[in-house]
């Protein structure tokens, strides 16, 4: 490995590489979420017949993982670089390995392993065949071929590549703590994120108002359902994301029992499934505009029979 890229140079390198592979460069979605997969740029676009190739950075919040900034590798909020390609290219793994080379990691000089780890997200009714990618013994990426999203079978199959940017940067820069990562020349990761990490951890574990969160969950759930009754998919999905984050805050606070936890997840999943079905129906009414004309004509003709 030659030059040690800064955090932002890693992002810029990945953006340029995946742009060259035909991916649109999207921006982070402006709602709290636990993973890049939950962005509508993945969750909604992975279903239905239309092609979709996109890449974006997604800050991901996981309240239960907060450690007050005292753990060098476990965070309330981390950053993922998300790539989704639909239909999945037959050479997606080769494309991924080539992206590592762009970051200065020669696959021939390192121990890179694809370790089977099938993926599931119960709260969104999503699952797929998956692998963790290990670089010299450290997981840096999750690879998934979606089989189901929002309770719907995916066709064509979407490939998802999720880079853990903090882990990748720690490896490239050879640092033991994420807070020592160089974000930009002369600016460390900790100088930007250590204080927010401490404050969000304190809030999540000690300060959050449980009664307010419980009330908010109910309100967000009702508002999602109300939006869906009017066929408003995207506002509804925003409220599904709010339900998910609110539940994660309640879970971190220890405010839900094991039995209640299952119930909350089921409620979020039920909403997500309705969102998914409504989205596909909405795209069909529009004539699946991202499809080429020949494929669109065949699909719409089949549905008319």
From Swiss-Prot:
<keyword id="KW-0547">Nucleotide-binding</keyword>
<keyword id="KW-0067">ATP-binding</keyword>
<dbReference type="GO" id="GO:0006426">
    <property type="term" value="P:glycyl-tRNA aminoacylation"/>
</dbReference>
<dbReference type="GO" id="GO:0005524">
    <property type="term" value="F:ATP binding"/>
</dbReference>
<dbReference type="InterPro" id="IPR045864">
    <property type="entry name" value="aa-tRNA-synth_II/BPL/LPL"/>
</dbReference>
<keyword id="KW-0648">Protein biosynthesis</keyword>
<keyword id="KW-0963">Cytoplasm</keyword>
<keyword id="KW-0436">Ligase</keyword>
<comment type="similarity">
    <text>Belongs to the class-II aminoacyl-tRNA synthetase family.</text>
</comment>
<dbReference type="GO" id="GO:0016740">
    <property type="term" value="F:transferase activity"/>
</dbReference>
<dbReference type="GO" id="GO:0005829">
    <property type="term" value="C:cytosol"/>
</dbReference>
<dbReference type="InterPro" id="IPR002310">
    <property type="entry name" value="Gly-tRNA_ligase_asu"/>
</dbReference>
<comment type="subunit">
    <text>Tetramer of two alpha and two beta subunits.</text>
</comment>
<dbReference type="GO" id="GO:0004820">
    <property type="term" value="F:glycine-tRNA ligase activity"/>
</dbReference>
<keyword id="KW-0030">Aminoacyl-tRNA synthetase</keyword>
<dbReference type="InterPro" id="IPR006194">
    <property type="entry name" value="Gly-tRNA-synth_heterodimer"/>
</dbReference>
<dbReference type="Pfam" id="PF02091">
    <property type="entry name" value="tRNA-synt_2e"/>
</dbReference>
<protein>
    <recommendedName>
        <fullName>Glycine--tRNA ligase alpha subunit</fullName>
        <ecNumber>6.1.1.14</ecNumber>
    </recommendedName>
</protein>
<dbReference type="GO" id="GO:0140096">
    <property type="term" value="F:catalytic activity, acting on a protein"/>
</dbReference>
């Amino acid at each position: 490995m030659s030059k040690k890229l800064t955090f932002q140079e890693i992002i810029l390198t990945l953006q340029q590489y995946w742009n060259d592979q035909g991916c649109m460069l999207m921006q982070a979605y402006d709602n709290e979420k636990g993973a890049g997969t939950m962005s509508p740029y993945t969750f909604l676009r992975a279903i239905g017949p239309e092609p979709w190739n996109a890449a974006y950075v997604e800050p991901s919040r996981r309240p239960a993982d907060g450690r007050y900034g005292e753990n060098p590798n476990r965070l309330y909020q981390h950053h993922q670089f998300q790539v989704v390609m639909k239909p999945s290219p037959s050479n997606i793994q080769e494309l991924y390995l080539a992206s590592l080379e762009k970051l200065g990691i020669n696959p021939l000089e390192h121990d890179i392993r694809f370790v089977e780890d099938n993926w599931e997200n119960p709260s969104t009714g999503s699952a797929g065949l998956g692998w963790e990618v290990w670089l010299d013994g450290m997981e840096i990426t999750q690879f998934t071929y979606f089989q189901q999203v929002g309770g719907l079978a995916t066709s064509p199959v979407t490939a998802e590549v999720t880079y853990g940017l903090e882990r990748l940067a720690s490896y490239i820069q050879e640092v033991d703590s994420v807070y020592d990562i160089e974000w930009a020349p002369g600016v460390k990761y900790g100088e930007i994120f250590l204080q927010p990490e401490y404050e969000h951890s304190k809030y999540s574990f000690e300060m959050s108002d449980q009664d307010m969160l419980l009330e908010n969950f109910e309100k967000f759930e009702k508002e999602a359902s109300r939006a869906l009754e009017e066929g408003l998919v995207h506002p509804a999905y925003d409220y599904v994301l709010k339900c998910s984050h609110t539940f994660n805050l309640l879970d971190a606070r220890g405010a839900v029992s094991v039995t209640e936890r299952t119930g909350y997840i089921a409620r979020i999943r039920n909403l997500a499934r309705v969102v998914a079905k409504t989205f596909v129906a909405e795209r069909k009414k529009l004539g699946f505009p991202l499809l080429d004309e020949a494929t669109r004509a065949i699909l719409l003709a089949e549905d008319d029979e």
